[in-house]
Amino acid sequence: MILFPAIDLKNGQCVRLEQGDMARATVFNLDPAAQAKSFADQGFDYLHVVDLDGAFAGKPMNAQAVEAMLKVVKMPVQLGGGIRDLKTVEAWLNKGITRVIIGTAAVRDPELVKTAAKAFPGRVAVGLDARDGKVAVEGWAETSEVTALDIAKRFEDAGVAAIIFTDIARDGLLKGLNLDATIALGDAVSIPVIASGGLASIEDVKAMLTPRARKLEGAIAGRALYDGRLDPAEALALIRAARKAGA
């Protein structure tokens, strides 16, 4: 299991939203690069970054902040938000992003995902953000008529590296991961699935390490880390112990 610390970018700052609402943003760090370095120093080994402004604008809007982070950390970084065409995919990968996350375009333009995954094996993930079971797009401002499983099935044989599945109703509210829905998705497709939205405490990490969640690649932690509800040292020690034991 990988525990991904999250950095969400809005106006060049590190923020957390509640249920994806840009009007309910809390600024946690004015310097995203410093936050990234802090996560690296704490021992995390994969960073999750979202360009929130980009998700709404449909193009990268926080490139300067992302590039500053890439200069100060050596760990892999996955990035989502505003990645809607092959040119943007290629540009980010060339700048040092390990894996791009395609969200809205996965619903609107599935051929982009297939083309990108073929061109850049192992470096293209799909972000599926669900509200009441249906996938939301355009920075979660619109809800489509398709389910996360419908979308995931489209990419079953496309070479997609991972699916990041977010329960919008829980995101930023510290209500706990929606493991039942995430595991159901993970069991239904062969693509590795990452849980996102609501991780609240060490109990969520423990739940991720149980046999029923074994197929999941990992989970994303946001507000719980910023609020101090999740101790990075404790969480990472549990994960490393589980890895040694073969979990």
Swiss-Prot record:
Protein location: Cytoplasm
UniProt KW keywords: Amino-acid biosynthesis, Cytoplasm, Histidine biosynthesis, Isomerase
Entry annotation: catalytic residues: D8, D129
GO annotation, cellular component aspect: cytoplasm
InterPro entries for this protein: Aldolase_TIM (IPR013785), His_biosynth (IPR006062), HisA_bact_arch (IPR006063), Isoase_HisA-like (IPR044524), Isoase_HisA-like_bact (IPR023016), RibuloseP-bd_barrel (IPR011060)
CDD domains tied to this protein: HisA
GO biological process: L-histidine biosynthetic process; L-tryptophan biosynthetic process
Gene3D superfamilies associated with the record: Aldolase class I (3.20.20.70)
Family: Belongs to the HisA/HisF family.
Name assigned to this protein: 1-(5-phosphoribosyl)-5-[(5-phosphoribosylamino)methylideneamino] imidazole-4-carboxamide isomerase
Organism encoding this protein: Bradyrhizobium sp. (strain BTAi1 / ATCC BAA-1182)
